[in-house]
Structure formats: C-alpha cells, structure tokens
Amino acid sequence: MSSSERLIYMSQPGVSIDWQYQAAEYYCQAIRGLKSAINTPAFDADPADHTSQSSVVSAAIAILSTYDLMDAPSMGWKPHLSALPLFSPASNPMAIPCSPVAVPQSIVEGPVFWSLARLDFLCASISETQTRLNLDDIPLWRNAGLAADENGVLLPFSPTGSGDIRASTGIQEDTRSNELIWLLGKIVNYLTSGDAINPEEFALPPGERFPLGVPQEQLLERWKILDTELQKWYDSLPTTFQASARTRRHDVASANADLNGFEQIWYELPICAATMQSYHMACVLLLVNKPQESTAIRTTLSARFRYYRQVQHQVLWHAREICGISLASPPDPVRVHSVLPLYVAGQVFHEPHEQRVVLVLLSAIETELGWATRYHVKKLTDEWQEEEHPLRSRLNVN
C-alpha cells in the first residue's frame, strides 16, 4: 500500500489507528533513508553548500534526535547524539557509539549547528558526561557564528549593515542565545570533570581514577573564569532580555493556592524567555558548585555559615525566576526548553508548596505537549522523599 493510499484508508470513519505504532514506523523509515543517503557518493560533495545533501542530512539528524529525545524518559538520552556531525569518537573515549546512523565529519553552520549544540548540551547534562562537541575548538564555533576572538573571549555584538532595528534585534536575540549554549557547555564540562586532571577520568568508578587531582585553588580559578564569562554575557544583553512585566496570581481555589507565592514573569520575545530560564539555571549550577577556599585559610564558622545562607538565598531567587517565566503562559517551544531549568529549580526547593508547583509545570508539559518529563518528576520526588527522611534513608529503615 502506497503512502497516499494509506492516508486515505486511515482517514475513513471507524478506522482505529495506533498512532504510537505509526510514529515508530515512520521513524524507522527515516533512519533507513538516512543510512541510504549517507552511503551515496554525493553525500560529501560540497559540505559548505547549505543546499547540499550533507547539510540536508545534518538537519535531518537534528530533527530526528529531537524527536527521539521527546520520549526518552531516562538515560536513553546518552547514546542519541553519537551521530553528531563534527564529532569524532576517537576524540572522546567516553562516548558510546550506538547511534543507528554514523555521520562523517563535515562543515555544519547556522541553525542546524546550534540545534545540534543544544542537544549535545542537554545530553551531557542529563547523562552527566562531557559534551561531544569540542568547546575549545574556537574556529569551529566562530565558523558557526559565535562572536568571539581567537582566545574564546566573547565580543560585543554589533549588527552588520542593517538599518532596520527590528532585523538587528532578531539577530541579537539569536546570537546571545547561542552564546549561552556555548557557555552552558563549558559549565557542564567543568562540573562533570570534577577534580580529575583528565576530565574523562572523573566518569570512571572511584577505584579506577588517578589518585592525584587538580588542586582546590586551581578549581576555584576555573570557576571564577566561568563566573566572570557568564556575568559579562549577562551585562551585554540588549533590553529585550529584560522582563516586560511582572504580575502575581491571586487564585482563591485551593488547587491553585501554591501558585500565589510566585510571580508571573513576562517577556515580549519567546526566545528571551527561554534564554533567561537557561541563564538562571546556569547561575544555580555555578553557585552551588563553587569550590571552597583552601582549608588552610582560616575563617570563622560564622563567616562560613553566612556565606552558605547567601548562596541559598541566591539560588532560591534564581529558581523562583525560572518558575515565574513558566507561569506566564509562554508558547510551547519555550515550555519544551524549560524542562531542564525546571528540573534544576526543583532540586533547589525544599518547601512542599514550591515543589508542587514544579511538579505541576513539568507534568503539564508531558500531558499537553507530549514531551516526556516523567523521568524528571520521578527523580525529583525520590530526592525530596530522601531529604524528608534523611536518617531513615541512611539507616535503610522503613
């Protein structure tokens, strides 16, 4: 039966359709089509040509990876992006090459590259591994549009040759959002490398790691560099990244009472809302992972606890900002990008009413959009239960 005949048959009244089966079948057909396309002689004929088969296949991989991740509830994230263009398995021995399609290295630019870079960051965050794309390969990132010098320092953005402020504004938003993806990749690589001299060694079991690590002072210097880069990025943002309005909910219904303590934070452009959620997530990750000064440097207990309270206050504020953006009824693409920031915010909250708000927001994404969040919901609820009964958990008492 041809595709057109199948569509006619499926549209007839009374025909019961298993949409999950249909989706899986078309996904398998797409994978077979990719394999066939890659094996053709013209695949790498002109990788710099955006209309070439290589660019089309790269775009298809980005789309299929996103489709695959929509219903990957747990560590199924880990192997999906082994087919990333510009990813060489030899450069990352910790990678798991179990993708159904192996794509040769090629030049990928523009939106396709940044879509792949975002997926790479998400996969690294969930699986707690290093990114597959080399963030230190500055020519690669500059070729994709990153405004940075040869040392990887972000440059002030200046639109080229456009007198239309609306056009230049759109370029700025995209550019700033892409820059944050690059910074987030650097942050997750910092976190997943631990104090290992070779970042990949930290992923090994404790008994197999090299016994010597990076000194605490050096880890702190790396942290300060990342913190400074993130602050410079934030300070350079155009005014469109500022919230256009802040409102408070006043629901009298008991079911919505948990939301009353949160602001609704509105942005004129959806890309700004999504980017700022990722920014607040980056701040939380950096704040809670700041290395301590050397224990040889004496400080009072009061000063140390005062610092802890300041960090707790700051991360709570960033977590509430993440939720406030999600509570302002953003469009569906923003909600999809909010899954990881909401998950991080949920790890920050310890008050039950705040935790319930995160669960409501995450569950609604899966219910209304079909993007799997049940893995994040289960992880959060398990962590909260352990926090609620820490002594029982440690003693394994029912």
Range-by-range predicted roles:
Residues 2-8:
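Surface-exposed intrinsically disordered loops and tails
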Residues 3, 67-70, 119, 126, ...:
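Alpha-solenoid helical repeat scaffolds
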Residues 9-182, 210-214, 218, 249-270:
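Intrinsically disordered, low-complexity acidic/Ser/Thr-rich segments used as protein-protein interaction/activation
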Residues 10-15, 156-333, 345-356:
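Cytosolic regulatory protein-protein interaction regions
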Residues 33, 40, 87-90, 233-236, ...:
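Residue position in alpha-helical solenoids
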Residues 86-93, 140-151, 203-212, 254-259, ...:
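Eukaryote-specific, cytoplasm-facing alpha-helical/coiled-coil scaffolding segments in long proteins
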Residues 232, 247-248, 266, 348-398:
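Intrinsically disordered, low-complexity regulatory regions with latent secondary structure
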Residues 337-341:
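Amphipathic alpha-helical/coiled-coil segments positioned at domain termini
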